[in-house]
Amino acid sequence: MYKSDNLKQTDNETFTYIIDKHKDFKILQLTDLHLGFGFISRKKDKLALNAVTKIIHKAKPDMIVLTGDSIFPFLPKAGTLNNRKQAYKLMKFMDSFAIPYTLVFGNHDCEMGSTCNKEELAQIYKKGKYCIFTEGRKELTGVGNFFINLTSSDENVLLPLVMLDSNMYGEGGWFYSGFDRIHDDQVDWCMTRLNDLKKCNPDIKAMAFFHMPPAEFKEAYRKMKLGDKSVLYQHGSIAEKNEHFGI
């Protein structure tokens, strides 16, 4: 776990991180690295690691957030199911930048038959020298639902960063069942926490980090295809335009 005079873990679901409110705080979000660290994925891993290294050196962020599918224990793509080894290698890579980082799980971090489940991966990531992570409440759906409250030196919360586990696959199991989502109990927990913060600052805003796109993404895509000018396309493509996109 990251050790700093500016960071304090107040309970099993909350960190406070003191920042200079007079300076910009830069957060770099990275997603879907799909690092396999196996013989099949060796070439793609090298490309991904080189790209991430260039991005981090150019961006010079104050914090990095990995929003899921960081590792990929999928035999046909990686040549290994050993996500324990993958997690340790990812952690070593991220620690090498000496920048605080945190993460949420995606649907690929713990594939069927992989060595570790999410609870076990959580214990690994908590060993990271620069990693900020906790499992969160056991009674909540998912693993890794927690807050990092960016706070001023006078202990006022400036910006809550909400980490949410958007879970893995649907009720049918793996792949063909579609994807899971952020569950109602997670939303209720999140809003309760935010409402508590609003008692001190009614105008407070928050940022949430998660892997699965919610239904609003599908609605925006539908409007864009219909030529709705209220939707602005910026960059990128959508590979999954079916019922698996936006839930």
What are these regions (language model features)?
Residues M1-R84, K89:
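N-terminal active-site segment of His-dependent metallophosphoesterases
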Residues F25-F37, L158-E171, F209:
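Active-site-proximal beta-strand elements of phosphoester/diester hydrolases
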Residues G36-F39, F72-L75, L103-T115, Y169-G172, ...:
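Active-site environment of divalent metal-dependent phosphoester hydrolases
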Residues H34-F37, I56-K60, M94-A98, L194-N201, ...:
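Sec/Tat-exported extracytoplasmic proteins
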Residues Q29-T31, I64-D69, Y101-N107, M207-F210, ...:
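Active-site neighborhood of phospho(di)ester-bond hydrolases with catalytic His/Asp-centered motifs
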Residues N201-I247:
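Active-site-proximal segments of metal-dependent phosphoesterases and phosphodiesterases across multiple
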Residues Y2-I19, K85-P202, L232-H235:
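Extended active-site neighborhood of metal-dependent phosphoesterases/phosphodiesterases
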Residues F39-K44, L75-N83, G113-C116, F175-F179, ...:
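Short, flexible/disordered intra-domain loops and linkers
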